[in-house]
């Protein structure tokens, strides 16, 4: 038994397949830079925190790690959340892939007081509870728009902040 597919449905399927192939080709040609959780004890850690650990902190950590690597900085960024989501939205993964990046972690991870204490710096998009941050100094970036509504504006605001941060850091000698 064969199901008839309308002309409009065939066109939509072809368009979807074409876009998927174009995205795959772009990733292959450009390459996807991966930045995972720090595995070296020799690197200082910067922590980016957003409420759910799934969007802004992921974007900031991924872009920070790219910039730090390009500039030879002995620092790695991680993404953390307060009330973490179960997963990173597909739209954010796709937009990061379009930037040649992947999220800083596979799934959102909650910030612990130990991580806050060990971080050389914490940047947050949302309030970090006092019992988690302890004595750690937190710099808040409240001017970043919602990335799920306007990824480009959010990314550009984050990257502007990151440029200011990395300019103050010394490159690895």
Which residues does each PLM region occupy?
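N-terminal secretory signal peptides that target proteins for export/translocation
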Residues: 1-11
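Bacterial N-terminal signal peptides
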Residues: 16-28
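Phosphate-binding/catalytic loops
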Residues: 28-32, 127-173
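Conserved active-site segments centered on acidic
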Residues: 37-111
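Glycine-rich, N-terminal phosphate-binding loop of Rossmann-like dinucleotide-binding domains
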Residues: 50, 126-127
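A short, aliphatic-rich alpha-helical micro-motif
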Residues: 116-117
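Conserved acidic residues
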Residues: 120-122
């Amino acid at each position: 038994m064969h199901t008839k597919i309308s002309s409009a449905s065939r066109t939509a399927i072809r368009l979807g397949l074409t876009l998927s192939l174009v995205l795959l080709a772009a990733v292959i040609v450009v390459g996807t830079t991966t930045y995972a959780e720090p595995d070296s004890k020799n690197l200082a850690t910067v922590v980016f925190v957003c409420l759910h650990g799934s969007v802004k902190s992921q974007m900031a950590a991924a872009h920070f790690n790219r910039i730090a690597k390009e500039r030879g900085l002995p620092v790695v960024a991680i993404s953390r959340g307060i009330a973490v989501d179960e997963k990173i939205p597909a739209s954010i993964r796709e937009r990061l892939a379009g930037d040649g990046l992947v999220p800083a972690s596979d799934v959102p991870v909650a910030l612990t007081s130990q991580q806050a204490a060990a971080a050389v710096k914490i940047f947050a998009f949302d309030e970090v509870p006092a019992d988690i941050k302890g004595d750690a100094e937190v710099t808040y970036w409240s001017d970043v728009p919602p990335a799920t509504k306007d990824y480009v504006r959010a990314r550009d605001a984050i990257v502007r902040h990151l440029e200011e941060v990395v300019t103050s850091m010394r490159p690895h000698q």
